[in-house]
């Protein structure tokens, strides 16, 4: 007897709503930082950068840094070797998890000292894009429509969701941030943020940020929107680009 496997994919029945926003402040940011990850921890802004290049071809430096968000001053920074493209970051239990793009590995640092405590392989052959956490589990994007749910104790996949905006599959899900039970995700090359239900992958809302580009200093290497950080102290969302 031959057995056939049928793959069934469930699309979303939710029509995303358009959320409004208000700019409450603007802060300085290193324009040479090719931002891949952004997160607050104890009122300090942590940032992961990659060595990608903007429109002029000038390359950035892959790094992990923590900064004073009000002044842009960098308190501490560690750089990755040039063969590694730094990607998303998240902080769980005072540990910083940082992904690399195509090296199939990530790093765990002490959030205070930036001492690298572990190098870990991905649970399967995927690219590393964005990462966030819900206080218990990690959530990792890989440039497709998938977001993987990962056990931080084993760094193995326990589940995944496919991201859909109504009936349309949403690919290139990039930087992630967990805010009030939802995953806020940058979509690569789109000037918008998707608000994603972590249980089923449905995009429940969209934040259209196309107008932000005209409000930043227009530099030759200004690239795309990337970087979402929620500050629980101020209850505001910090947005940047690379």
PLM regions: where:
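Beta-strand-enriched, solvent-exposed domains that form extended recognition/catalytic surfaces
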Residues: 1-14
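A short helix->beta-strand "capping" segment at the edge of beta-propeller domains
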Residues: 12-32, 69-75
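Beta-strand-rich domains and repeat architectures in extracellular enzymes and scaffolds
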Residues: 24-65, 77-90, 130
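Beta-rich, blade/repeat-based domains predominating
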Residues: 31-42, 82-93, 123-135, 167-179, ...
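Conserved beta-strand positions in repeat-built beta-propeller and related beta-rich domains
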Residues: 46-57, 98-103, 138-144, 185-189, ...
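Short loop/turn segments that connect beta-strands within beta-propeller blades
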Residues: 67-72, 110-114, 151-155, 197-201
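Blade-loop segments of beta-propeller domains
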Residues: 71-109, 115-125
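Hydrophobic, well-structured mid-protein blocks that either form specific transmembrane helices
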Residues: 106-164
């Amino acid at each position: 007897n031959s057995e056939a496997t049928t793959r069934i994919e469930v699309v979303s029945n939710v029509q995303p709503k358009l959320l409004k926003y208000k700019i409450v402040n603007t802060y300085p940011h290193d324009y040479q930082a090719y931002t891949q990850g952004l997160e607050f921890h104890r009122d300090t802004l942590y940032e992961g950068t990659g060595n990608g290049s903007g429109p002029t071809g000038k390359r950035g430096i892959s790094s992990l840094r923590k900064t004073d968000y009000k002044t842009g001053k960098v308190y501490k920074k560690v750089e990755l070797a040039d063969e590694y493209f730094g990607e998303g970051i998240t902080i769980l239990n005072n540990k910083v998890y940082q992904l690399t793009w195509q090296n199939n590995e990530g790093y765990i640092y002490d959030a205070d000292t930036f001492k690298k405590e572990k190098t870990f392989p991905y649970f399967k052959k995927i690219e590393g894009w964005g990462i966030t956490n819900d206080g218990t589990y990690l959530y990792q994007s890989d440039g497709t429509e998938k977001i993987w749910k990962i056990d931080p104790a084993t760094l193995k996949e326990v589940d995944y969701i496919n991201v859909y905006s109504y009936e349309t599959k949403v690919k290139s899900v990039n930087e992630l941030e967990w805010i009030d039970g939802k995953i806020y995700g940058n979509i690569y090359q789109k000037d918008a943020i998707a608000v994603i239900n972590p249980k089923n992958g449905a995009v429940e809302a969209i934040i259209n940020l196309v107008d932000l580009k005209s409000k930043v200093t227009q530099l030759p290497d200004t690239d795309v929107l990337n970087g979402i950080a929620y500050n629980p102290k101020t209850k505001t969302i910090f947005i940047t680009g690379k």
